[in-house]
Regions:
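Membrane-embedded alpha-helical bundles that constitute the cytochrome b-like, heme-associated redox core
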Residues: 1-155
Length: 155
């Protein structure tokens, strides 16, 4: 079927595109002590007590974890996908079978973390607008990403 033929090529496009995004955003997603503290107190955020959360830059600890998890997943998908691409690569049957399991498990895991990400975005008022339009209000930035707000506004 066409999906079976196109899947590997779309995978290459996805991997190359993600590599470009990774190279662009990796420095903004380095974990800091404030991110670790934010993650340890994430329950407060979920409970709506987000006013006393540690100051965050452009991305919070949860967003940074999402970035690194997706980066690792795309890498594993690319490697396992290459092992599965029998039209161009000749791998032993055992490696192909293991790669199929790894590929499917990583894809399922990625779907799960994307679902959590979407749920978290819905949960945090103003986030859907930020993802849809690429902008946030000053008040939202000041409340959720104070360090970034100060960096951008100088206040």
């Amino acid at each position: 079927s066409w999906t079976r033929i196109l899947h590997p090529f779309i995978g290459v496009i996805m991997a190359v595109s993600f590599l470009a995004a990774f190279l662009r955003f990796r420095n903004l997603n380095r974990m800091t002590p404030a991110d670790r503290e934010w993650l340890s107190r994430a329950r407060e955020m979920v409970d709506g007590n987000d006013h006393n959360m540690p100051e965050q830059g452009k991305y919070n600890g949860g967003q940074k974890m999402m970035f690194w998890a997706m980066s690792l997943c795309v890498l594993l998908l690319a490697v396992s996908g290459i092992f599965l691409w029998r039209a161009y690569f000749n791998m032993p049957v055992g490696i192909v079978r293991l790669s199929a399991v790894v590929h499917a498990a990583i894809a399922a895991f990625m779907i799960g973390i994307v679902m959590v990400h979407v749920y978290a975005a819905i949960w945090t008022k103003g986030t859907i607008r930020a993802m849809w339009y690429g902008t946030v209000t000053r008040a939202w930035a000041k409340q959720h990403h104070r360090a970034w707000y100060r960096e951008v506004t100088g206040k």
